[in-house]
């Protein structure tokens, strides 16, 4: 997901709870 927004493989860091 978007960086720093969602806990998805594309998020760094994975912040949030949406996949």
UniProtKB/Swiss-Prot annotation:
GO cellular component: extracellular region
Subcellular location: Secreted
Superkingdom assignment: Bacteria
Keywords: Antibiotic, Antimicrobial, Fungicide, Secreted
Entry annotated with the keyword Secreted: yes
Example GO biological process: defense response to fungus
Residues passing through the membrane, by range: none
The keyword Secreted is assigned to this record: yes
Principal location: secreted
Free-text function comment from the UniProt entry: Has antimicrobial activity against P.wickerhamii and against Gram-positive bacteria B.subtilis and B.megaterium as well as Gram-negative bacteria X.campestris and P.solanacearum. The synthetic peptide partially inihibts growth of fungi P.capsici, V.dahliae, F.graminearum and F.omysporum.
Protein name: Antimicrobial peptide GP-19
Originating species: Xenorhabdus budapestensis
